Structure formats: structure tokens, C-alpha cells
Amino acid sequence: MYSFFVLASLLGGALASPVLGLRECTRGSAVWCQNVKTAADCGAVQHCLQTVWSKPTVKSLPCDICKDVITAAGNLLKDNATEQEILMYLERTCDWLPKPNMSASCKEIVDSYLPVILDMIKGQMSHPGEVCSALNLCESLQKHLAELNHQKQLESNQIPELDMAEVVAPFMANIPFLLYPQDGSHSKPQPKKANGNVCQDCIQLVTDVQEALRTNSTFVEALVDHAKEECDRLGPGMSDMCKNYINQYSEVAIQMVMHMQPKEICVLAGFCDEVKEMPMKTLVPAEVVSENVIPALGLVEPIKKDPAPAKADIYCEVCEFVVKEVAKLIDNNRTEEEILHALDKVCSKLPTSLAEQCQEVVDTYGSSILSILLDEASPELVCSMLHLCSSRGLPAATVRVMPRKDGGFCEVCKKLVGYLDRNLEKNSTKEQILAALEKGCSFLPDQYRKQCDQFVTEYEPVLIEILVEVMDPSFVCLKIGACPAAHKPLLGAEKCVWGPSYWCQNMESAALCNAVEHCRRHVWN
């Protein structure tokens, strides 16, 4: 039953392209061999079987299911089963599809192309994979590797596995049918969507099933036994194959049911409408929102409020996990853009119960975590800097020591001003800059802190005055004398002291005053 369900579902999508005209058929194998429908319309079925569909394929569950179904269908033909009997099996499977338009499309395809499919089965009984490639249920290995080639270098010749979550989803979608078999007429109307009570009934049913799975071990056995009884409805041959798949995948399906939301399962089953917009996150107190939205507040005293210990510990653990993942990506020489893109998938490695908190940390602090680590900060200190972990009991920081450059305070000046530039908002007041300066040195690696404190003590007055106007590290440190001047003197230096109103009036002035980066980040954006 499951095999035919998956086969019919994928068949409907694979063969849903429009009928080709004569003009399209002149374009060669790339058009002919898309699927059974295009090959039949262009009279190229045998050509595609011999030259395209016989190539190696990616190992995947849909491909394996298809091969078993085609083999079983071939055995039924050997046993003198009629085409009408096979058609009946496929049409019955089409009736199980959750949406009326999918069911109708599935039946139309089966009715129109059954002779072609049966001819292929008869001629390729020893090679069912070729038939499955024609049905687009087995993917070409060459095509798959070509798509991966632009993302990463192929490291081995092992055939890649596909995502198990995608292929097991149809099994979970059929759970309500297993508990309450649908034996009525195929022409009965489909259940109403979420605007009636059916959606809520489905959610309640799945909720009860999940609760029973958690608390009653015998319920799991009864559920699996009931599913195997349903296999007997398929008749000889198919029944054994159906039970074999239940033995292999029932445990995986049950685990996924346990970790999915009831509404998600009911959407897959077609009893609830899919929600198009993104779900709203849980609202949090206003002061926590402001602290999360502006990472710069990491430099200010935290609000005197004792958060719930359990919640604080969770965010601390999640932050430490994200920091470790980012550190691994940095060690692998990934670019900043690649790291930020990879962060979107980091939370999928955590249990579902932590995924929401993880996504909050990534969305709010992802860029700050990356910036702090790129400034050579110790990974153990990052979450404390962001006030997500307590600083008590931290181990001695192990930092990657960077070679110092000539120029006195030049290196530490650039690091400090660069950190302030990333974390202070535009038009910050002198008081905000002073507060940030007083604490800024504690955010730098150990080897820079002592020198940073000395630098702030010596340059604080002039530093605050210029930081009110500009925070470009190279310009500021050169202007206050912390970094040595270039070999060629700056042209037009008198005009450059006029500030951003002169620097950013055009690209020529910005380049003349070494303020291009400042203008891009603070004025021209």
C-alpha cells in the first residue's frame, strides 16, 4: 500500500508536463527523455531506454520503492494478471492521494500511458531501474553530481544518499488512514479543509496518537500490526513487499511523527490548509527585545533583572553551540558570506525543543558572533560578551595570537575602533562612546587588553571628539597619530578636517580623505 502510494504521488508530479508538439520533438534527447510522457509523445521511448535511462542513478528511497513496485508488477504479469488488475491497483492508489486535483491528474496519467508503462515493464523486467528513471523516480547520478559540482568538490566516488525526511513524509501523512481505514466509495467527497471541524479533529487525533506513543508501548506494536493488516488488502506479492517496508521504516516514521507538530502532519494529509505566512514567534518582554535587536547594547550594563534560570541556561547552551559551529566554519577558511548562509542550517542539528531558541540566537546575534570571532576573540568568551552566559567560572581564554604590526598603538587602535564601528549606532552621543570605550578593551583578545587600556587612557579626549564624527578605523587611527602616516602625504588635508559633510559629497572627496568606507556605511546607504 505504501509503495503504490509513494509511486502514484511521484508519478503525478513527474508526468505533469504538457503534451509536446512536433516542433519541440525536433530538439533531441534533452526534450525526448524528460519522462515517459515526453518520450511517448515524440516516439523515442526505446531510444531513451537505451541511451539515457540506462545510466547509473542516485541511491534513494523513492528509487528503491519504484524498483520493487516495477518488479512486483512484472511478477503479476508473469502470473497472467491482466492489465485491468494492475490499472485497478494504480487507480485505487490515486484515490488515496489527499487532494482531488492530484488524484484526478494521477488517474489521467495512468489511463493515458498505462500501455507504454506496461510495455516498458515487460521489456525491462531484469532492469527495473530503467523504467523508474523514465518515471523520474530514479535520478541520474551524472545530473546529480553536476548540480553539486558548483557547491563543493567531489571527495569520493560513493553514491550520495538523499534526504530521508522528504521521502518518509508520505508514510506519516498516511497515519490517519491507518488508524481509520477509508473503505467507502472512491467517489465520496473530500473532507473539508481548515474552515470546518475536520482540521481540528485531525489535530486532536494526531495529538492523541503522539500522547499514546509516548506513554503506551503496546500502542506502537498495535499500530504497526494494524498497518501490516492493511497490507493484506493489496493481494499476493504486493502484500509481502508492503510488510517488508513497514518492518524497515515504521520505526523511522514513528520517530518523525513524535517530533512533528500535529498541524504539520494534518497539512501533509490534506485535512488542513497550509499556512503561507511565516509563524509568529513567542512574544518576549520589551526590554529583552531591545537588548536582542541592538547587539551594541552588549557594551552597556544589562538590565537588573533575574531571568528564569532554566531559560537563561538554554540560551547559553544554544549560544555556545552556535559559536562552536561558526568557529569550525572559520577554521575551514569559509568566507563571511558562506558562513552566514550556513548559519541558517545550524539549528537543524539540534533537537526540536531547542530549535526555536537556536533560531532566535542566530537571527539576533549571528552577525555579532561572527564579527567577534573574526576579531580573534576567544570562543569561550563570545556568549559572555553578548550577555547570554554568565562570566563566572570561565576557563582561561585560549586565543590565536596574531603577529603585531609596527606603529605603536596602531593595531590595537584599529581593533578597538573597528569593534565600536560595528556595535555603535550612527550618531551615537559622546556619553555612549565614552561608555563603550571604558568597556571596549575587555572585548579584545588577552594580548591586546593591557595595551588597549593604556591607549584609551592616553587618547581618550581626542578619540571621543573624532569618533562622534567618524568611526572608520584606518582614518581615525591615522588622524589621532596612533598609526604612522603613509609615505605620500594626504593631499588636501586642510579640507579633510571639515568632516563627513565634505568627505561624502562625492567619491573624489571620499577617496581624497580616506573616508570611502565610512561614507558607504554611514551616509550613502
UniProtKB/Swiss-Prot annotation:
InterPro entries: SAP_A, SapB_1, SapB_2, Saposin, Saposin-like, Saposin_chordata, SaposinB_dom, Sphingo_Act-Surfact_Prot. Residues 18-58, 489-525 form the Saposin A-type domain. PROSITE patterns: SAP_A, SAP_B. Keywords: Cleavage on pair of basic residues, Disulfide bond, Glycoprotein, Lipid metabolism, Lysosome, Repeat, Secreted, Signal, Sphingolipid metabolism. Residues 59-142, 195-276, 312-393, 406-487 form the Saposin B-type domain. Residues 1-16 form the signal peptide. It is found in: Lysosome. Residues 17-59, 143-195, 276-311, 392-405, 488-525 form a propeptide. The lysosomal precursor is proteolytically processed to 4 small peptides, which are similar to each other and are sphingolipid hydrolase activator proteins. Saposin-B is a homodimer. Prosaposin exists as a roughly half-half mixture of monomers and disulfide-linked dimers. Monomeric prosaposin interacts (via C-terminus) with sortilin/SORT1, the interaction is required for targeting to lysosomes. Interacts with GRN; facilitates lysosomal delivery of progranulin from the extracellular space and the biosynthetic pathway. Saposin-A and saposin-C stimulate the hydrolysis of glucosylceramide by beta-glucosylceramidase (EC 3.2.1.45) and galactosylceramide by beta-galactosylceramidase (EC 3.2.1.46). Saposin-C apparently acts by combining with the enzyme and acidic lipid to form an activated complex, rather than by solubilizing the substrate. Saposin-B stimulates the hydrolysis of galacto-cerebroside sulfate by arylsulfatase A (EC 3.1.6.8), GM1 gangliosides by beta-galactosidase (EC 3.2.1.23) and globotriaosylceramide by alpha-galactosidase A (EC 3.2.1.22). Saposin-B forms a solubilizing complex with the substrates of the sphingolipid hydrolases. This is Prosaposin. It comes from Bos taurus (Bovine). The lineage of its organism: Eukaryota, Metazoa, Chordata, Craniata, Vertebrata.
